[in-house]
Amino acid sequence: MKLPHKFKISVGGCPNSCMKPALNDFGVEGHKVPVFNSDMCRGCAVCQIEKSCPSKAARVVDGKLKIDASVCKECGVCVGKCPFKAVSHESETVYRIYVGGTWGKNSRMGTALSRYVTEDEILPLIEKTMLWFKENAYAKERLGMAIDRVGADKLEAALFSDDLLARKDEILAKEVLQHP
């Protein structure tokens, strides 16, 4: 498939961002979403959840654990640390997808899709992103620039429908768009 510009993919297994998923055209970041059961919390003086949380999102306040969702990175480090099982995780690893990131002299933080996806959704999303890129970007235009020009909402709507895959042969047959 001839694309308008290079297309870099990054895959990281956790939110530490070692592979810089938000700074590549398509980035995958694994998450273990913790589930807090306040009924199981006994408000330990030395809370193992609070002690283990690398982002300091967990704090014991008035004898009960509180997890600040705006700070929590959903890394899953806290899962299994409480001897009373106050924190568990969703049954499977979920993934945050970033699209349109670049780094270097023209850096752009990738746009995070609005929802987590499962492992089975990743490969079709990569294919759909590449098809959208081919159909919407001008020659030598990076994916992030095309997203900024066309709109992240339009990209996301296309990625979560099957329209691009239904038109795959048509899109692949087209030449790369030239600047008007």
What is the meaning of each model-derived region?
Residues M1-F7, V61, E135-R149, L165-A173, ...:
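Flexible, glycine/charged-enriched surface loops at secondary-structure junctions
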Residues H89-E90, T102, T111-Y116, L143-A158, ...:
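Accessory RNA-recognition modules of RNA-modification enzymes
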